[in-house]
Amino acid sequence: MILPGETVGIVGGGQLARMSALAARAMGYRVVVADPDPDCPAAPVADRVVVGALNDPDALAPLADVASVITYEWENIDVRVLERLAEKRPVQPKVDVLRTCQNRIYEKQALERLGIPVAPWRPVLSAEEFPAALEAIGLPAVLKTATMGYDGKGQAVIRTPEEADAAIAALAGPPLVLERLVPFACELSVVVARSASGEAAPFPVAENIHEHNILAYSIVPARVDAAVQAAARDLAVRIAEGLGLVGLLGVEMFCLPDGRLLVNELAPRPHNSGHYTQDACATSQFEQHIRAVCGLPLGAVDLLSPVCMVNVMGEDFPLNVGAALADPHVKLHLYGKREARPHRKMGHMNVLAPTAEEAFARARAAKAAIAGRR
């Protein structure tokens, strides 16, 4: 057990590290982050920044000299870095979990071994394998890079045979994953925490709405049947247990029109769709992550109020903060990024309301207000 007063190390210094660091410091921990940018978003709230590339084991080795436990804020990290750090300090979630989740082929193979439903898919390890995969999966389909995919990057939808060659060229070739494009009713996600003792705690189910392939809104509770919500949370727990997770896991799913669920992607870290927990749950996902990786008992995951999270993007700048906060139920969280660019996540708002529908409506209004569109 890592107790307050000791140091938590975080590989990566973006907004997830920033909010994890804030939660850790509130609990009395010291925090050291590792990032290539000495002025990364987490820097102002960390005790120290180890400056180095996230694919350079030597540059990040000093993190193990000061941290009692090490975690990471995203999955596209060179596993060699964490393997080196794990020689000296516990790394949670474990390197094997990261290795599985950062490669879509390994991820889908792991899900199938656990009996978790996924969309029909085929690995494409060479250009020669692509025609057979396309024939097996059929159209429409989506072609994805096996690695380095996030926020809609590394994906191409194929609706006609003519689009197939362009898709494989656009993604710079194998290794790739070809999936059937399923006609889903909505997209859901569950953030689940699991402790070293095996205790698992799934947060309430979020219903997610994307714009430009980037998460825009997370509505909680999700507007689906209670049975679907229970099934989603059960799937998340089964995956966490099957992976031997210690820490946090974001599980993205498709909900089909008949209520069946297909798991789409995994992220072994705090998740954008879990930001609502900061203001609407008994324990935030960030505090829960720190509890789990430090070996502490997990916190309660009760939903205290219906809520809608809305991302604040670079194209919303300059911000009209006063207009957005005119609704007293809007909670603003900005990440301290120096440059606002289109489609870059700059912050988020959590909007509380008596019902999920009202929270969604207020979130849309807050989004328009902060961007100066009303």
How should each PLM-predicted stretch be described?
Residues 192-196, 253-257, 336:
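Short, low-complexity Ser/Thr-rich regulatory SLiMs
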Residues 1-109, 113, 128:
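ATP-binding N-terminal substructure of ATP-dependent carboxylate-amine bond-forming enzymes
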Residues 213-223, 265-278:
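Short, flexible active-site loops
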Residues 291-374:
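Peripheral (often C-terminal) accessory segments that flank ATP-dependent C-N-forming ligase machineries
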